[in-house]
Amino acid sequence: MIESKLHEAPGMPTRAGLINTITTATTLLTMLLSGCSSANKQAHTLYVAYSIADNEFTQSSKERIEKQISLRTQLFLRTNPNTRVVTVAYKDSQLQDQVTKDSQLNLGPDIILAGDYQLRNLYQDSLISAFPNSSVWAQQYSDVLKGLSTVDNKLAFAPYGILPQVSCYNNKTVKQPPKTIQELVMLGASGVRIGLSTNPYEIFWTAGSVGAIPEIGSLINSKYQKKLQPKINEWITWLRQAALYQNISFYRQNSELVNELANNNLDWISCHSLDIVRLREEMGEQLSIATLPNGVQTKAFAWPGVLGYGLGTDSSPTQRELALSYVKANTNAVGQRRVMLLTEDFLPANKAVDIPNQSSQTLKANNDSWNTQTLSYLKQWPMIFQYLETKSALAVGKTLTELTSGNISVDDAVQALTNLGKKGKE
């Protein structure tokens, strides 16, 4: 999911140009206001960069995300009213390279809001700084989130929110969400239009429901690659059979599922909590959220995203203090609970925030996805990550697309997914 590079798309101003424009505008505004204001203190500027998936880098997406960031910025401005916060959007695929280029010019951002995987890569390349007093910052997180964000006992980035993988559906058509994948198939047979993605990060939840995750994880060890994998075969067979049903359709990306549900071309999809705000804007009260269907004996392998804040390396001492204040305002329990209740599109990273399961079906679904589905696979997660790095997530997605399109057989798909060649460890 969720689940998520620092530079403008073609046609957007360069970072240097943006800074010059803002500096000029700030100077002029200060001069204009100096005669009618008793407080002539010039505002400090804090640059917050964030990334958007390449295929979702549109004006509407940027406006929607900017609106969400604005909620977080308001928390910060309560205690830092004389600060100007400037946000800049970049494509995911460009983040690493452009932060590198900007940092070489001492023009890097003060804060980067991105996914945990991106932030770890930035930290490894010394493009973001560890948090000072890391042990104090880390106290607000669970052991799982500390493990994701800590490198050599230093907090590489500050987790902000968990973005659980859930199901989104039209409650006018789906009266009762399916609790198992067997019920999901029955739902499709009744005429409900179901959408699934062949992206491995979006479809591996079904491998969990079938019980295939342990076998997939075992493939990183070469001695298991030539053994029979009955659960993997069962999972691939389930996907192939699902593709044969009239009302179950497969798409390459999660964004396509969201578009189709919003346009009333689908009734039930797998989604991420980050999609909730957009879908709610377009579907209104017809949108409902539930956990993904489990199997009879095993849980869905719900793949979450984790969003966090990284500290840029080019901040002045004043900007660094402001950046730390911004992150603190957005990761403390009060701020996190406030935004959670307003948006319902994430789970707070701060472990001190209680989730109101009784009053919000959406937050309950997010909470159950993370705590009862995702965390039930703690032992398997490292192996699944390694499998997709070794095999290549793109190659896995291509195989699953070929399978669900009818271009290859179940046996061919199983062979393709289980044959890691010499890349598996001995």
PLM features per residue range, with description:
Residues A89-Q98, S249-N259:
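Short helix-initiation/N-cap motifs at beta->coil->alpha
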Residues I65, A365-K425:
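C-terminal capping/gating helix-and-loop segments adjacent to ligand/active sites or protein-protein/ligand interfaces
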Residues L119-N121, S270-L287:
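A ligand-binding cleft/hinge motif common to bilobed small-molecule-binding domains
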Residues I2-S4, T23-Q118, L420-E426:
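Conserved N-terminal structural module of periplasmic/extracytoplasmic solute-binding proteins
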Residues A114-V166, Q176-K179, S288-A290:
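Hinge/lid segment of periplasmic solute-binding proteins
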Residues A156-Y160, Q165, Q182-N233, L266:
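Extracytoplasmic/periplasmic solute-binding protein
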Residues E281-L347:
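Extracytoplasmic/periplasmic substrate-recognition and gating elements
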Residues N221-Q253:
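Glycine-centered hinge/linker elements that transmit conformational signals in sensory
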